[in-house]
């Protein structure tokens, strides 16, 4: 894929950068793999806002993506590459030799007509899924499981990947894009290559309305609120924050470490912020 800068024919298109979608399927998605997706607008079952700045936006169907890739030994042909409104990565529709169809995250470089295979005996080829114990050290991988059989949880967004650094006993060491080195069970599966649509990070939406289409509402700065609404609020005229940046509830907002999962601390060999002081 490539990017294109839009001509400044209006204020909204000035500075807009889009990803060229040539080669993507132009028709409707595969209906049997669609599910209804209800919008919560950031509210819980009591109607209370649990996530701010959400609401509105276009309605979407959820595309059921196969993150387990557990149909071993059966070759699957890539029928087409599709846009998925629910994620930054593109998805590929596979047709297995027995007639079943499944969506997967589309790896970089994959095209319609390619044949993919899952299982321990699969070749080391972009798009194939294998247990980590069968993948050579130094291979670039994505869609990595954290627990055997649970399905891919790591490196699923556009352009994401990880590198298999070492294997020792029951665990392998994987370096993520963030710099974090993590231990993964060698029976967990991973897909060869990296996720496609890597130009996604270069996209510029151009106008506020494009965020509203995505269900993202405006964010109001704390310094323009009243003291009752935010720790940064109040003052006569324009004032600064007068304290360290915090959330509306007083939690430090920039660089504050919030991880609190001691159960899995021993699985992290090197933290992602180890070079940040």
Curated annotation (Swiss-Prot):
Family annotation (InterPro entries): NA-bd_OB-fold (IPR012340), Rib_uL2_dom2 (IPR014722), Ribosomal_uL2 (IPR002171), Ribosomal_uL2_bac/org-type (IPR005880), Ribosomal_uL2_C (IPR022669), Ribosomal_uL2_CS (IPR022671), Ribosomal_uL2_dom3 (IPR014726), Ribosomal_uL2_RNA-bd_dom (IPR022666)
Q: Which domain of life is it from?
A: Bacteria
Compositional bias segments (type: Basic residues): 50-60
Identify a single GO molecular function assigned to this protein: rRNA binding
The answer to whether the entry has keyword DNA-binding is: no
- Give GO BP annotations, semicolon-separated: cytoplasmic translation
| Sequence segments annotated as region (Disordered) | 37-60, 223-265
The UniProt entry's GO CC annotations, sorted and at most eight, read:
large ribosomal subunit
Compositional bias (Basic and acidic residues) at which positions?
Answer: 229-244
Start-end of Polar residues biased regions: 39-49
PROSITE patterns per UniProt: RIBOSOMAL_L2
Ordered alphabetically, the record's keywords are: Ribonucleoprotein, Ribosomal protein, RNA-binding, rRNA-binding
Pfam assignment, any one: Ribosomal_L2
What assembly does the database describe for this protein? Part of the 50S ribosomal subunit. Forms a bridge to the 30S subunit in the 70S ribosome.
Q: What does this protein do?
A: One of the primary rRNA binding proteins. Required for association of the 30S and 50S subunits to form the 70S ribosome, for tRNA binding and peptide bond formation. It has been suggested to have peptidyltransferase activity; this is somewhat controversial. Makes several contacts with the 16S rRNA in the 70S ribosome.
Q: Which family does it belong to?
A: Belongs to the universal ribosomal protein uL2 family.
- The entry's protein name is Large ribosomal subunit protein uL2
Species of provenance? Neisseria meningitidis serogroup C / serotype 2a (strain ATCC 700532 / DSM 15464 / FAM18)
Organism lineage string: Bacteria, Pseudomonadati, Pseudomonadota, Betaproteobacteria, Neisseriales
